[in-house]
């Protein structure tokens, strides 16, 4: 028997190694180095949103009521963007605008920048969490790569778009009805639905939903009998460790339905990853274009002909008129700081008015 005589290998751990051991320890909820970014930012972002929707008015920024305290409900409450006069100020609590006054900070819209910036870093922290966990259990990082899609959309809509405009005022406020208002704004002022990047985004998201439904149904349809007898919900109580569904049967079925079918599971699942993530990225790229006020398709020849010929109209020209109506109504209501006043005869009227 050989006895090794020498210095003990157990040296005292440094601060970094001790922190690494604690952060990456196996526990019910993994923390990790990414958790140092994720958990505080997510906590502050959600806390700011709950605080704002419960107590904080938008009277000073938008001339609106936006909190439960003022009578709003879950669908109409929001954390509103700062006033347009504040441009792209970070609105730090200790900054020159609020000067440490918390009430004044809330009135100025400071909670919006607080929620938006902490929310963006929380999403980035969540993506890093997926990278970190994948590395620790020796998985490839496709989950984290896929999550780049939602991050790209959030950053482009809530941060890049208002940075390209005159201020945070033109970003979406954080609320359900507020997001609907923002969608109408995008349509009226940017003709967003005719933008090819929006079309690619819709194709990606709805296509992914279709793929998900088809894939789930096909796997359920081709589950192997596992000896327990027929059970519609066999997926919930599997008793076999090996592969549970037949790719060959699924391939045969869809070959007969469409004439083509996936023959490789890896290609099938990569396609299910590729379609929604690409759609989200295309939407994000389109919103960056809108930040720079790039136009969607303009079919000027149809507009000119419609102006000259009362009998000529297309769905495009009708939509252009609808957009003009949105702008006429929205500009005065949505941008009170501009003091816009339109003559009554130029405003579209509905039956209720």
Swiss-Prot record:
<dbReference type="GO" id="GO:0005506">
    <property type="term" value="F:iron ion binding"/>
</dbReference>
<keyword id="KW-0472">Membrane</keyword>
<feature type="modified residue" description="N-acetylthreonine">
    <location>
        <position position="2"/>
    </location>
</feature>
<feature type="binding site">
    <location>
        <position position="269"/>
    </location>
    <ligand>
        <name>Fe cation</name>
    </ligand>
</feature>
<keyword id="KW-0148">Chlorophyll</keyword>
<feature type="binding site">
    <location>
        <position position="143"/>
    </location>
    <ligand>
        <name>pheophytin a</name>
    </ligand>
</feature>
<feature type="transmembrane region" description="Helical">
    <location>
        <begin position="208"/>
        <end position="228"/>
    </location>
</feature>
<dbReference type="Pfam" id="PF00124">
    <property type="entry name" value="Photo_RC"/>
</dbReference>
<dbReference type="InterPro" id="IPR005868">
    <property type="entry name" value="PSII_PsbD/D2"/>
</dbReference>
<dbReference type="GO" id="GO:0045156">
    <property type="term" value="F:electron transporter, transferring electrons within the cyclic electron transport pathway of photosynthesis activity"/>
</dbReference>
<protein>
    <recommendedName>
        <fullName>Photosystem II D2 protein</fullName>
        <ecNumber>1.10.3.9</ecNumber>
    </recommendedName>
</protein>
<keyword id="KW-0249">Electron transport</keyword>
<comment type="subunit">
    <text>PSII is composed of 1 copy each of membrane proteins PsbA, PsbB, PsbC, PsbD, PsbE, PsbF, PsbH, PsbI, PsbJ, PsbK, PsbL, PsbM, PsbT, PsbX, PsbY, PsbZ, Psb30/Ycf12, at least 3 peripheral proteins of the oxygen-evolving complex and a large number of cofactors. It forms dimeric complexes.</text>
</comment>
<keyword id="KW-0460">Magnesium</keyword>
<dbReference type="GO" id="GO:0010242">
    <property type="term" value="F:oxygen evolving activity"/>
</dbReference>
<dbReference type="InterPro" id="IPR055265">
    <property type="entry name" value="Photo_RC_L/M_CS"/>
</dbReference>
<feature type="transmembrane region" description="Helical">
    <location>
        <begin position="41"/>
        <end position="61"/>
    </location>
</feature>
<feature type="modified residue" description="Phosphothreonine">
    <location>
        <position position="2"/>
    </location>
</feature>
<keyword id="KW-0934">Plastid</keyword>
<comment type="function">
    <text>Photosystem II (PSII) is a light-driven water:plastoquinone oxidoreductase that uses light energy to abstract electrons from H(2)O, generating O(2) and a proton gradient subsequently used for ATP formation. It consists of a core antenna complex that captures photons, and an electron transfer chain that converts photonic excitation into a charge separation. The D1/D2 (PsbA/PsbD) reaction center heterodimer binds P680, the primary electron donor of PSII as well as several subsequent electron acceptors. D2 is needed for assembly of a stable PSII complex.</text>
</comment>
<feature type="binding site" description="axial binding residue">
    <location>
        <position position="118"/>
    </location>
    <ligand>
        <name>chlorophyll a ChlzD2</name>
    </ligand>
</feature>
<keyword id="KW-0597">Phosphoprotein</keyword>
<dbReference type="InterPro" id="IPR000484">
    <property type="entry name" value="Photo_RC_L/M"/>
</dbReference>
<keyword id="KW-0560">Oxidoreductase</keyword>
<keyword id="KW-0408">Iron</keyword>
<feature type="binding site">
    <location>
        <position position="215"/>
    </location>
    <ligand>
        <name>a plastoquinone</name>
    </ligand>
</feature>
<keyword id="KW-0793">Thylakoid</keyword>
<keyword id="KW-0813">Transport</keyword>
<feature type="transmembrane region" description="Helical">
    <location>
        <begin position="279"/>
        <end position="295"/>
    </location>
</feature>
<keyword id="KW-1133">Transmembrane helix</keyword>
<feature type="binding site">
    <location>
        <position position="215"/>
    </location>
    <ligand>
        <name>Fe cation</name>
    </ligand>
</feature>
<keyword id="KW-0479">Metal-binding</keyword>
<dbReference type="GO" id="GO:0009523">
    <property type="term" value="C:photosystem II"/>
</dbReference>
<dbReference type="GO" id="GO:0009535">
    <property type="term" value="C:chloroplast thylakoid membrane"/>
</dbReference>
<feature type="binding site">
    <location>
        <position position="130"/>
    </location>
    <ligand>
        <name>pheophytin a</name>
    </ligand>
</feature>
<keyword id="KW-0150">Chloroplast</keyword>
<feature type="transmembrane region" description="Helical">
    <location>
        <begin position="125"/>
        <end position="141"/>
    </location>
</feature>
<feature type="transmembrane region" description="Helical">
    <location>
        <begin position="153"/>
        <end position="166"/>
    </location>
</feature>
<keyword id="KW-0602">Photosynthesis</keyword>
<keyword id="KW-0157">Chromophore</keyword>
<dbReference type="GO" id="GO:0016168">
    <property type="term" value="F:chlorophyll binding"/>
</dbReference>
<dbReference type="InterPro" id="IPR055266">
    <property type="entry name" value="D1/D2"/>
</dbReference>
